[in-house]
C-alpha cells in the first residue's frame, strides 16, 4: 500500500527521457537502446569464444559505441552531444582511475569468494610416495561467512573518501590509495601463494582476509575521491556522461577480476593475478601524478 501511495503527489517529477514523445515513440527509443545492447552482447559472447578476453572486450565496447552513434531520430543529437566527452583527454585518464577504484571494488567482490572457496577449500597433502597432491580441506573457511566483509567495508567507507577529498583534494587521496593498493596486492598475492601450496592453508586465512579488506577499504575511499575529481574536472554538461561512461567501463571489473583469478588459480599460480593487478595500480599512480599532481599538471589536484 505504501508503494502505491508513494505515486500520489509525484507528478511533478521529470521523466528519465526528456521529450519522450508519444508512447509508441518512447517505446521505440527504449527498444532501440536495448536492441543495441542485445546485438553487441551476442557479438561479445561470440568474440570471447574465438579470441582473447583482452581483445574481445574492447571490440565489444567499440561496437556498442559505434551502433549508438548510428541510432536515428531525435535521440541522435543528444547522443552526439554526449560523445563529445571522447575528445577530452581527461575522460580517458579518469576512466583508468575509475577502473582502479570502482573496478577493483566490484571485481574483488566477485573474486574474493572464489579465492576463499578454491584456495582455502583445498590443501596440499603429502602422499605415501612423497608426492604433493591437492585434496579437500575438511576445515575450510566458508566463503558465505567471510566474503561479505570486504564489500561491506568498501561500501561503508566510500563517503569517507569523498569527505577527505573535499578537504585534501581528490587526486592526493587517489595517489595515496593507489600506493596502498600496490603494496596490498603484492602482499595478498604472496600470501595466496603460500596458502595454495600449504598443507595448512587455514593458518594464512586471517592475514589473507585482512589484506583483502585493506584493498576494499582503499578502493572504497578511492571511489569517493575519483567521483569528486570527475565533478571538479568536467563542466555541468559533461560530468554526467563521463561518470556514466567511466562507471560502465569499470563495471567490467566484475567480469575481469574473477576470470583472471580463476585462470591463475587453475594454473596453480594465484599470486600472478594479484601481481598483475599491482602493476596496473602502479600505472594508475603514474597517470594520476602526470595529469593532476605534477608541477605543470593539466589540472592541479582536483
Where are these regions (language model features)?
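C-terminal membrane-cytosol helix-exit motif in multi-pass small-molecule transporters
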Residues: 1-19, 34-76, 285-292
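Multi-pass alpha-helical transporter architecture, strongest
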Residues: 6, 10, 191-192, 276-302
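Juxtamembrane cytosolic amphipathic helices that cap and anchor the N-termini
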Residues: 22-37, 84-101, 204
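Extracytoplasmic gate region of multi-pass secondary transporters
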Residues: 37-56, 88-155
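Interfacial helix-cap and linker-helix signal at transmembrane-aqueous boundaries
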Residues: 47, 116-117, 164-165, 260-269
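C-terminal transmembrane helical hairpin of 12-TM major facilitator-type secondary transporters
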Residues: 142, 171-225
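Helix-to-loop junctions at the C-terminal end of transmembrane segments
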Residues: 157-170, 265
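A late C-terminal transmembrane helix in Major Facilitator Superfamily
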Residues: 233-269
Amino acid at each position: 500500500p505504501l508503494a502505491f501511495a508513494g505515486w500520489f503527489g509525484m507528478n511533478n517529477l521529470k521523466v528519465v527521457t526528456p521529450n519522450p514523445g508519444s508512447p509508441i515513440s518512447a517505446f521505440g527509443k527504449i527498444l532501440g537502446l536495448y536492441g543495441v545492447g542485445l546485438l553487441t552482447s551476442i557479438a561479445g559472447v561470440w568474440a570471447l569464444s574465438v579470441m582473447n578476453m583482452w581483445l574481445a572486450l574492447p571490440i565489444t565496447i567499440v561496437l556498442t559505441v559505434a551502433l549508438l552513434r548510428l541510432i536515428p531520430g531525435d535521440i541522435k543529437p543528444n547522443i552526439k552531444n554526449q560523445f563529445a566527452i571522447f575528445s577530452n583527454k581527461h575522460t580517458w585518464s579518469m576512466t583508468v582511475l575509475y577502473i582502479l577504484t570502482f573496478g577493483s571494488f566490484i571485481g574483488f567482490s566477485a573474486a574474493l569468494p572464489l579465492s576463499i572457496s578454491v584456495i582455502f577449500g583445498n590443501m596440499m597433502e603429502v602422499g605415501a610416495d612423497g608426492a604433493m597432491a591437492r585434496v579437500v580441506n575438511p576445515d575450510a573457511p566458508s566463503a558465505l561467512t567471510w566474503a561479505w566483509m570486504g564489500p561491506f567495508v568498501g561500501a561503508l567507507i566510500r563517503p569517507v573518501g569523498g569527505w577527505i577529498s573535499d578537504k585534501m583534494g581528490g587526486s592526493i587521496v587517489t595517489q595515496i590509495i593507489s600506493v596502498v593498493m600496490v603494496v596490498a596486492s603484492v602482499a595478498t598475492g604472496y600470501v595466496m601463494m603460500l596458502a595454495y601450496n600449504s598443507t595448512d592453508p587455514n593458518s594464512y586465512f586471517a592475514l589473507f582476509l585482512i589484506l583483502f579488506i585493506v584493498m576494499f577499504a582503499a578502493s572504497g575511499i578511492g571511489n569517493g575521491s575519483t567521483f569528486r575529481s570527475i565533478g571538479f574536472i568536467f563542466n555541468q554538461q559533461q560530468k554526467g556522461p563521463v561518470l556514466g561512461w567511466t562507471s560502465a567501463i569499470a563495471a567490467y571489473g566484475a567480469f575481469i577480476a574473477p576470470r583472471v583469478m580463476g585462470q591463475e588459480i587453475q594454473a596453480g599460480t594465484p599470486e600472478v593475478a594479484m601481481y598483475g593487478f599491482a602493476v596496473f595500480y602502479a600505472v594508475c599512480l603514474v597517470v594520476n601524478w602526470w595529469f593532476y599532481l605534477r608541477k605543470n599538471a593539466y589540472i592541479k589536484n582536483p
